[in-house]
Amino acid sequence: MEQYEKVEKIGEGTYGVVYKARDRVTNETIALKKIRLEQEDEGVPSTAIREISLLKEMQHRNIVRLQDVVHSEKRLYLVFEYLDLDLKKHMDSSPEFVKDPRQVKMFLYQILCGIAYCHSHRVLHRDLKPQNLLIDRRTNSLKLADFGLARAFGIPVRTFTHEVVTLWYRAPEILLGSRHYSTPVDVWSVGCIFAEMVNRRPLFPGDSEIDELFKIFRILGTPNEETWPGVTALPDFKSTFPKWPPKDLATVVPNLDAAGLNLLSSMLCLDPSKRITARIAVEHEYFKDIKFVP
């Protein structure tokens, strides 16, 4: 750890404290994440070390780069490139950005490119939200943070500072107790973030798992065996759920054009097997008027 000098604490993430720090060798500013492990006495699980080592191989312009992993005294420190702005802060501080449909489109495109890359390497995020989408102010490019950490460390119900981990972007199959979820969970989260960028407020701001599910069902309709084969067999599905009809998404996200609504509805498909993939989403006609120059 001698190589890194902590400058200041910049936040508290899902897994532990995040510091702004300086690399004494290169003089570069970096973000240092201290991972707090549940079983402090047992040190760092070897599975976590293996998972994290794989993430160092991930290199893409829309992924926050994991530069180093430091394992010292039963603690794990992850060294990331430093970016001080996230999408939540950006939406809160400059609402005018959201009035620009091109900016929303550019951000969404970059999120999907980053996700498609991760999914092609069989890495899931599982906890995507505006707070872990980081923005480089100089280039306006967007990068995904914390990819792969859920698999290495699990997702706690509360953070180490007892904040509740948000449910607003969590896919219905996870909320219904499915143990066999996969890449579609991330596409769902991106759909929620897309709608939030356009509407300037969260789409499904539930405060408990059942409230979250019902907020989803009120808009997209309560699923049944016709619309989502197998749904009634999921562990937390109840036949007593109220049966809401689906709403027209155009009334829910009124500022989105037809192509955008088509893309959004294919991302917010309740049945994960029918949800669009990130790889196919980047080719959608909604993006036809942007030529992204790397």
From Swiss-Prot:
The modification Phosphothreonine is found at residues 14, 161. It catalyses: L-seryl-[protein] + ATP = O-phospho-L-seryl-[protein] + ADP + H(+); L-threonyl-[protein] + ATP = O-phospho-L-threonyl-[protein] + ADP + H(+); [DNA-directed RNA polymerase] + ATP = phospho-[DNA-directed RNA polymerase] + ADP + H(+). Phosphorylation at Thr-14 or Tyr-15 inactivates the enzyme, while phosphorylation at Thr-161 activates it. Keywords: ATP-binding, Cell cycle, Cell division, Kinase, Mitosis, Nucleotide-binding, Phosphoprotein, Serine/threonine-protein kinase, Transferase. It holds the Pfam family Pkinase. One of its GO terms (molecular function) is protein serine kinase activity. Residues 4-287 form the Protein kinase domain. CDD domains: STKc_CDK1_CdkB_like. ATP binds at residues 10-18, 33. Belongs to the protein kinase superfamily. CMGC Ser/Thr protein kinase family. CDC2/CDKX subfamily. Plays a key role in the control of the eukaryotic cell cycle. Component of the kinase complex that phosphorylates the repetitive C-terminus of RNA polymerase II. This is Cell division control protein 2 homolog. The lineage of its organism: Eukaryota, Viridiplantae, Streptophyta, Embryophyta, Tracheophyta.
